């Protein structure tokens, strides 16, 4: 059976209704029973409670919950309560960020027309769009939403905006004639689709599909079956949590074995090992990562990128492929006049000579044979027509003034079948001289002229004369060949071309279609939606950063390729293909070719998903931009879905991870830079936290091996983890951005946070902190270098160890600022948040160990000035030690 767009309107009626007659009431009822309501199916939604519970799936969070339970069993209710509060707060933050992530189907429903004009009992009546059924005849006019998919049976200049479905920016001129052969969605001119919008004309269509069977319904099905990808950070943190738990268990196992060998009871040894495991886990890590990402979202929002899903902030830093829409993202989304072809030569739009009669005549004609206007700064009408009046304004010629002086006395509206538009204007005064001069006759006041514009091939068949600098003469085949060649040249460069002609008519003549003959050819005007000024630089930065930019558009291949060449995405024509080519490829073949294709034109939603999957199957992290309903499934399939804030539909926004408030490709590149920096900063924060915890574990291990008292009370470790550690860790997450990161290739998606080099840094920091803390503990425990009356004690040793561990970690924050030795350079001062966190941390720890009255709260012995100086001095040594290690590592690596 033929597709409906391949059938005539009569064949379509017979195929659906069995005859050309409208549906009877009985047939309407039967069809409603058979096809159901014209509505999208309800998708299963997650409740807020489900979303909240999902926040506890991360492995590290599970470990923390177990740690809290163990702490409670051991009687350490303080630790258990703090841990549970921290992970609950983190879950609340995550829930707030994701609670709106599944609204796509709701937005699709909003696109449906609430009412439609349908033929019932021989008359068109308004009914709710949900009551429309297959076989109904629906009337459309300008301003209507199309309520269902259907075959056009009557067309009077119908123009439909299908950009939400096809991605094509310009309105589509509809045609009631059948189409031969296969045609992509955007080229099925005799069809209309649910969710599109009528911008001009009127028509009637036969409903062929409703509800989930419409093109929008198919997209809804794709959207509901498309699984969201986990971001690299989500996978990394999960992997990190598993590895961290294994490391902690290994250490605790060692400690348990040592304790048993020393003769301690197995039960006591086990409880001590579990307590150490609780202390080793960085309780605030999840919250710190969430807070750092939240700060990142605020910065990106100021730079026109709104993050809807928090983990996407970091995921941007892993992006290796950006699949971008063309219109409005890489281009300005505004048609602009590029060239004129008049009296046999091409002229750039800005170079029009207003004193040249032929050039001025073409400019006037384009503004008069034109229905667009500008009201309160808003352009009204077809984009190609607004481009024609905008260039006039730019050159100092007001369309309002010209239209007032050259009143329209008649018109033949544009018709997609004949592809022409004509107006009859009464032209007088100075303007009449341009036309009368062309006709080599005396100027006459109030002469009527027919001005015609349209497709080049159609207009050339209707002209018999041509305007030249020497006047009007008969047009020759050579003239037509030159005009056709110029049109071909414009088209090959992705330009949209209109031809203009005119002729003198009798005063008061009511124009008829037959009058569009024997015209005088005046010239051509080419237009395009030009690239954004910043697109070329942004594409170049992508390539430098090892990111592959890919254009995916519903527009024609020639237009897409021309833009892609201008901005650097496309170097060779072989790198461009159309959706029909993808249909001929298996998924495996597409994976093989995807590296070599930079431009995809005339693509469907299914094509977009296949393209994204092909890149993902090759191990890439893919960002996908889109603004239409047709983009939503691919946005959801992509690792990072990027919706347009200005032109984007609610559907695309709800399916996305990020929304661009300026619809600008350069903003995506800036967001990638932010993502890379945030990932680096999060690693610095993790390095800072784990170095300190590792140092604490080593100190406890040392004390256990040598049968010394436990150096730390539980309150000490909680104080450090939740107070003096959290703020520096957050501050490290706010380190200033480093532009040089955009000179590096994207990191592999499966790269673990805990690389060998990263573990070495954690180890070096932990050992350094351990040494300084152990020395402080021994000084206090044995009473070395202390006043005789103070003496040594386990409590003093514990206090000095606590103070040194805390201050060492505060100083270590400066070590973690960079992989390079920068502490003794000016860069140490470039993070005001870290300096503030250091100062606050120093105040808090000093109060805890030196303020009388707080000793019982923190289980310490109040220190005097000598002991304080010892603590500060030992802690500071951590900086030169780690900086020396970095310098040695850097020198070795340089060899």
Task: List where the protein language model places each region.
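Conserved cytosolic headpiece of P-type ATPases
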Residues: 1-743, 753-754, 767, 802, ...
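ATP/pyrophosphate-binding catalytic subdomain of soluble kinases
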Residues: 769, 773, 807-810
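Generic alpha-helical transmembrane segments
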Residues: 724, 798-813
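Membrane-helix interface motif
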Residues: 774-786, 850-855
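Membrane-water interface at loop-to-transmembrane-helix junctions
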Residues: 749-767, 792-800
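Helix-coil boundary and interhelical linker segments in multi-pass alpha-helical membrane proteins
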Residues: 704-713, 779-797
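A C-terminal functional module that forms or caps the active site or interfaces directly
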Residues: 816
